[in-house]
Amino acid sequence: MKTDTSTFLAQQIVRLRRRDQIRRLMQRDKTPLAILFMAAVVGTLTGLVGVAFEKAVSWVQNMRIGALVQVADHAFLLWPLAFILSALLAMVGYFLVRKFAPEAGGSGIPEIEGALEELRPVRWWRVLPVKFIGGMGTLGAGMVLGREGPTVQIGGNLGRMVLDVFRMRSAEARHTLLATGAAAGLSAAFNAPLAGILFIIEEMRPQFRYNLISIKAVFTGVIMSSIVFRIFNGEAPIIEVGKLSDAPVNTLWLYLILGIIFGCVGPVFNSLVLRTQDMFQRFHGGEIKKWVLMGGAIGGLCGILGLIEPEAAGGGFNLIPIAAAGNFSVGLLLFIFIARVVTTLLCFSSGAPGGIFAPMLALGTLLGTAFGMAAAVLFPQYHLEAGTFAIAGMGALMAASVRAPLTGIVLVLEMTDNYQLILPMIITCLGATLLAQFLGGKPLYSTILARTLAKQDAEQAAKSQNAPAGENT
């Protein structure tokens, strides 16, 4: 009898200990399942919309090119039609942005950063259709823009939409789902889940509230977005450059030199972007007609440029494998680099709905390949492969300009599937980042956000000054 009683007591003690352990575990992990569920919904929606946006842009581009092919034998029709089609498509994007959702202009990433700090509004019912349709117009016109900016902003706005639909009122949920959508958007644009996570942690580090709940939600959203992307597009890397050879240790100093070059180029590029933005602002002065006509002219010129020098137009994804393969001479690579710098400045700084990641990756590829080809001639004993410098250059310009070296490294490695180049990439991107910081360069997105907030404050101050006068009349 005593044995049965002691056995019963022992079993009860074990059960109580298990319950206590479970209770402690539940107290330790306070992640609300509702937020994780909504993060999965946000990631799935962002993946679906991101894939739809990519397909829609490709459809518009194919329709435009197909129309040009029909009149390819008639030069007197081909050139005007190339200008008109691209101009009309671009004007659609500029008009929608200016008329209905000014915050949908440009990349959209600074807007998400501002929204994470509760400094910028998130009007998803306006931004989602304007960014999607406007991006179809500008990117479909062949302008030098990327789709990553739109998908990041679309993802963030989808996060806020889901929050409103489920009527979540907590500030933590609002912040977390916005960041989750942005990370899922980058992942959906580049098929780069780890880069999407790092982008939020690194690039948006001043705004992102890193805690157990938010990081789990970001992971969940990125996973769902990546799964959706791969269901529709497969698992192949989006930039096919083939498997490149590893960089020997005795050649790593060349990658540091390349990083120094990009450390000088990055701040200059950022300065040119801001100066070009000011130039366009002085030109149109906020008038919608001037702004739309200006956008149409830029879009039309990109359409013409696509006939003359196709490599100088478009986002750049098609150019990267060709340039990295060494199909161009050093002189031609530098010429295309300069041409694309000009077109990137015109397209992005004018406020067109579109990103700058893809154009920067193409610019980095061009300059990196040119450096690699020149180094191969100067140092034949190393048996250098120019493609490895192209890969390093892709991330270096982004690291120097955006000041997000980890994101640049991981993004390029995921996009190209050349993980063996991680060491030369670290050397190049770190050198570019440190020198850009030493030269006083400011991160591009943070600077654009600061200018946007300054403009917002000036407009609010002007309204407050005019309010008494309006009330007295």
From Swiss-Prot:
The chain crosses the membrane at residues 33-69, 77-100, 124-141, 148-166, 215-232, 253-281, 288-309, 330-349, 355-376, 422-438. Residues 1-32, 117-123, 167-176, 202-214, 282-287, 439-473 are cytoplasmic. It comes from the Bacteria. A motif (Selectivity filter part_3) lies at residues 355-359. Pfam families: Voltage_CLC (PF00654). GO terms for molecular function: antiporter activity; voltage-gated chloride channel activity. It is found in: Cell inner membrane. The record marks 203 as: Mediates proton transfer from the protein to the inner aqueous phase. Keywords: Antiport, Cell inner membrane, Cell membrane, Chloride, Ion transport, Membrane, Transmembrane, Transmembrane helix, Transport. A motif (Selectivity filter part_2) lies at residues 146-150. A motif (Selectivity filter part_1) lies at residues 106-110. Its main location: membrane. Proton-coupled chloride transporter. Functions as antiport system and exchanges two chloride ions for 1 proton. Probably acts as an electrical shunt for an outwardly-directed proton pump that is linked to amino acid decarboxylation, as part of the extreme acid resistance (XAR) response. This is H(+)/Cl(-) exchange transporter ClcA. It comes from Salmonella gallinarum (strain 287/91 / NCTC 13346). The gene is clcA.
